[in-house]
Amino acid sequence: IQWQDGNGTGYHINIVDTPGHADFGGEVERVMSMVDSVLLLVDAVDGPMPQTRFVTQKAFSQGLKPIVVVNKIDRPGARPDWVIDQIFDLFDNLGATDEQLDFPIIYCSALNGIAGMDPEALADNMDPMFQAIVDIVEPPKVEVDGPFQMQISALDYNSYVGVIGLGRIKRGSVKPNQQISVISVDGTTR
């Protein structure tokens, strides 16, 4: 997502969705290895679901600090205070650190594209959520000048372009159509 703050500063924010169910544990772990933080999306009426526990545990095991997003805040019966209490209890039961227990909260209606730091004072857009991401999440630490290195989290194949690697750049940079080598764990190059 390309986003510009109120001062005109532009940001590129990568948002990666992950399945919420334990049945997709491997996929969740792959996604967690590519991110610097997590947006934990929780319904303003229902609160944390059983699968929330699984995904949150994976985030904590990676040392990530969640940003809690209470969605559907405009829904009849929304109970944000109860939801936040439930999230705090969940985090505590999962052994969250003090830093993880001091989680930021954003309230939103994703369907209506509105967000805010207070459930009673939402902006007419999602800017408060993006601003919170920019303010809270540190940019990735990448050695831009070094030789290209990417941690591959998943491989795919396309008959037109060949092997497609999804992952996180750890060092250097890559340009469109640039040829690269894939080095396997055993050192073989392809």
What are these regions (language model features)?
Residues 52, 80-87, 126, 130:
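Amphipathic alpha-helical segments in well-structured domains
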Residues 72, 85, 177:
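Oxyanion-binding/catalytic loops of NTP- or PPi-dependent enzymes
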Residues 6-13, 18-25, 32-82, 143:
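Conserved Switch II/interswitch segment of TRAFAC-class P-loop GTPases
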Residues 91-190:
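Conserved catalytic-core segments of large NTP-driven translation/proteostasis enzymes
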